[in-house]
Amino acid sequence: MSSSSSLSSSTTTATTTSARIRLPSISELTSRSTISGGSNNGNGSALKSQISPRLSDTSRILPSILKNTSGSSTPTSSSTPFKCPPIKSTVGGTLSSGNTQSNYVLGNTKINSLPRLSSPTLPVKVQPQQQPQLPPASSLSPVTRVINTPPQQPQSVSASTSPNTQYQYYQYQQQSSPIQQQQQQQQATPAATPTVMQMAQNQPSHPAPLQYATQQYYPQPVYYQSPAGVPPPPPSVTHQGHIIAVHQHPGHLPQVGVNGMPPNVGYTIVQPEIVNKSTNRCHRCGTTETPEWRRGPKGVRTLCNACGLFHAKLVKRKGAALAAEEVLNNKVTKGKNGRRISMKKHLLNESLKQQQQINGVGIPINGFNHQILPPSFKPQQGGIATLPPLMHGQYPNNVNNLVIHQPPPQQQQQQQQHNNIC
């Protein structure tokens, strides 16, 4: 552009050699006043004559949109003009059109309903757009209402964006129309759920912002199909601590009788298994119960707690060999008051008891039920006999039988004479 202006200035000044050659300044070249005819000098008019054929004052079309139009500089009749407020120049001075609006027109025929932007300097009248008619709320189901409701926008949206939102809502309504038709066809079929149909009939006349269709669900029993060849496992019933295995016959269903027992079904009582635990026995005293088992001459856990302590004491005193011999040979048993007595002493006591019982047995005298006393018995005068000392506090069973009556005096004299002769 600067080269064209310099050429034009050189051609104008070529006729007069005496005149000075003046080149346009950068501000003159860049300012819009020179293009629109605001300056009156010759250079400005030359620049205007060169640039005006390309950009006219009546309609200036953007070069990028000229390709869409079929080579025509004016827009088609179907497109609406896009008006912009006047722009003030930076150098000082306004456009040649004055306070009128500029005639920049978008040549794109596809954009027909663009929103108009409001200007703070000039009031622009916004033409009311016709809103699409919506079907009545009673004919729509709750599901279609949820689909048809546009996205809620905050109330702080400016007036300039309101036509755009209406346009979007209109497009959204047009796109959702086939979905409404499908849902209305589905509602016409008898397979529709009763809850959705009932809610659609009871809806109020005014549309609600968001309504969701609810459906009630009820628990139903679940049946598992088992293969026909495999019978179900027989149930097991516990009765009085025993496990009862029920044997079912093929082709019959299980029945429940009184107290949970199946009637007329053969069953066998399975008794619990008894585990025989190995019981330890002390090698010295023979007991089976002890707080702790100890090591003995024949290995671990062979002596009870008391016998094990006694064996350990003998090992320290006499050695292992003598301790083992005394522990194994001199066995003990439980005596009186829970005390332990060696087997040798116990056998001696038992033999003495048996001898005393044999010696204490008497023979009847003179046809009376009297007992014959041992030889140590000596009768005294007066007819009362004294008993020999008894061991271990033992007394005869029949004490009254020990009283011997004195024989008649004739028999006493005969016995004394017989003793003197001998």
UniProtKB/Swiss-Prot annotation:
Description of what induces expression: Up-regulation during the yeast-to-hypha transition is dependent upon the function of YAK1. HOG1 represses the expression of BRG1 via the transcriptional repressor SKO1. Regulated by TYE7 during late-stage biofilm formation.
Native source species: Candida albicans (strain SC5314 / ATCC MYA-2876)
GO biological process terms held by the UniProt record: cell adhesion; cellular response to starvation; filamentous growth; filamentous growth of a population of unicellular organisms; filamentous growth of a population of unicellular organisms in response to biotic stimulus; filamentous growth of a population of unicellular organisms in response to starvation; positive regulation of filamentous growth of a population of unicellular organisms; positive regulation of filamentous growth of a population of unicellular organisms in response to biotic stimulus
Sequence intervals crossing the membrane: none
Zinc finger (GATA-type): 282-307
Lineage: Eukaryota, Fungi, Dikarya, Ascomycota, Saccharomycotina
Protein name: Biofilm regulator 1
Primary residence: nucleus
Known function: Transcription factor required for hyphal growth, biofilm formation, and virulence. Promotes formation of both conventional and pheromone-stimulated biofilms. Binds and recruits HDA1 to promoters of hypha-specific genes in a rapamycin-dependent manner. Involved in the switch between two heritable states, the white and opaque states. These two cell types differ in many characteristics, including cell structure, mating competence, and virulence. Each state is heritable for many generations, and switching between states occurs stochastically at low frequency.
Domain of life, source organism: Eukaryota
GO CC term (a single one): chromatin
Cell compartment(s), UniProt: Nucleus
Region Disordered, annotated ranges: 1-86, 116-207
Biased composition (Low complexity): 1-19, 36-45, 69-81, 120-143, 160-194
Phenotype reported upon loss of the gene: Attenuates virulence in a mouse model of systemic infection.
